[in-house]
Amino acid sequence: MFAPPPPAHPIWFDAEAQPESLTTLTRSVLRDAGVPEGDRQVFPETYSTVDGVFTFRGGPTRSGGAFGRVPRKPVALQLVWTHQTAQSRAPWFGGTGWTGQPAIVRWPDVMRHSMPKLGERTRQAGFVEVIQGSLDGRVHFLDLQTGKPSRPPIVTGNPIKGSVSLDPRGYPLLFVGQGIPENVPIGLRVYELIGHTEVFFLPGADKEAPRREWGAFDSSGLLNRVTDTYVVGGENGLLYLLKLHTAFDPIALSLAVAPEVVRYRYKEASSQHFGVENSMSALGWLAFFADNGGTVQAIDLRTFTPLWAFAAGDDTDASLALDTSLPRPALFTGCEVDKTGPKGFTHLRRIDALTGTVEWTNSFECRGALTPKKIDAGLFATPAIGTGDVADLVFFTIARCPGPENGAVLALDKATGAEVWRM
């Protein structure tokens, strides 16, 4: 059995439930028999001690995702390499979808040597691999330096729109959410990267789900390396926690999981729209997400009870970016113009992460379309939190605002929400 990860320091803070925001929200928690009620889920301060990008936007704050450093002030962008994917059926074909960010990992030596499908790269010290899900239904593995395939792709059977996620302990364990039902049942598929075997399948057509007819997983989950658990939202309207029971032996070249499942099911009385497309944010024992009806929630992962809820006004697919550098942790979020469309406003907000209090709102007019096909507008991209020289700014990218031929990158003042510049 592989040695346990190094000790991790949990994040502690004071936060109390806001019952006035929860009067119209009902919930239930469905647990497999082996998962105790008191199973404590607290994310450590450091998501991973391995060099890489292991989930969408890098980790629980959904505010990173970069790998490496720019050595000097760049004056131009240069295309270094490209990789051509295969193609699935129309209309998805190939390439990447929303969100489509790759995972990147500098494999630790013991992990690299445990994966024979890497071939000669098992002996390449410092090897960095790019792992990309595609609309062609495959997961592609590329050498970061050359862009050449580093091992054979994994064929999942369905187009992948979201971002794959890797085990932040450095274990060769890959989580792939499928976006479109095409050839096989749709859901979350878990693969070991020793022999590329599927070790677990979480079906999207869950009999406990409020939205059983759509089982996609565009969300990129979070793995708690301390508790060996994985949390992810489904478009079927459920929030899942998987207690993995991971068994990895790099000497025997074996990796197995035996997940037990916790399901968080909820209903907001004012909404008939279910489904989580964004990737959950987390701070210690608090998790944050939004749904297709615009309900933004904070839940206590230790008990799976909601702490607060907020009605954003419309579908919220962009992940909630969490800024922990402020005196109090804040969430930056925004909604689309979808159910309120085709003409309406995208509302960009800063929310106190501990209370759900809206600290500012800045709204921008947008225009979607109903014909010849429905097209939504507003915020789809996850906000980017400024650091360093731009630590006072937060960046939003909005679509079809104010009209169908327009879009903008907005820099807003973190403290006030005022527009500083746009492009």
Cite the ranges covered by each PLM segment.
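Extracytoplasmic/lumenal domain signature
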Residues: 2-42, 48, 56, 63-217, ...
